[in-house]
Structures are given as C-alpha cells and as structure tokens.
Amino acid sequence: MNEKTKELPACPVETTLTLIGDKWKVLILRDLMPGTKRFGELKKSIGTVSQKVLTAQLRDMEANGLVHREVYAEVPPRVEYSLTELGQSLKPILDAMWNWGEDYKNSVTGN
C-alpha cells in the first residue's frame, strides 16, 4: 500500500471529494475535457481564480494523477496542461453535474 492510499478516506464519495471537491478543480476539469490548454488559457477560461491558487490546484491535481503538465524548452517557456486517462475518467461525473445544474436552473426559473 502506498502513502497516498493510506491517506484516502474509507468512503468512495469522500475519496472523490478529496480529489475534486474544490470549486477550482471542477472548473479545471471542465476546461481541460476538450483538450490541452496553456496556463494563460486556463486562467482566462476559468475567470476569477488567482494565479497562485490556479498553480496550487494544478500541482495538486498533477500529484494525484489527474493532470499532466508538459514543459517545452522554448523561450519563453511553454507549459501545457492536459488530463490524464484518470482525469478523463471523470467525464461522466462532470456531465452529470452539468445536467443536474441545468435541471436545477430550469426548475428555479420555471423553464
């Protein structure tokens, strides 16, 4: 058993929330689902997240195997982020959140 496995909660729902339970992580997943993005593109698409917070969230997601970070030896340096296979496996969860959010908005607005 590795160190990460020992730290995971017994409840699978809690485990999932441990990995993606932050507002920014869910939005990062949403914005990387279509494909690779550079840091600036991610920051712009997410909106109000600070550079410091986005960097910390991406590092955490990379450490947990959800995001791949590719650094290119160019001037200026180019860094791209993409979802790993594990990150892509969260698509049905994000799709369900999208559908639930649409249903909720429609029920509240009467549409």
Language-model regions: role of each:
Residues 1-8, 105-111:
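HhH-family (HhH-GPD) DNA N-glycosylase catalytic core used in base-excision repair
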Residues 57:
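Residues within the DNA-recognition helix of helix-turn-helix
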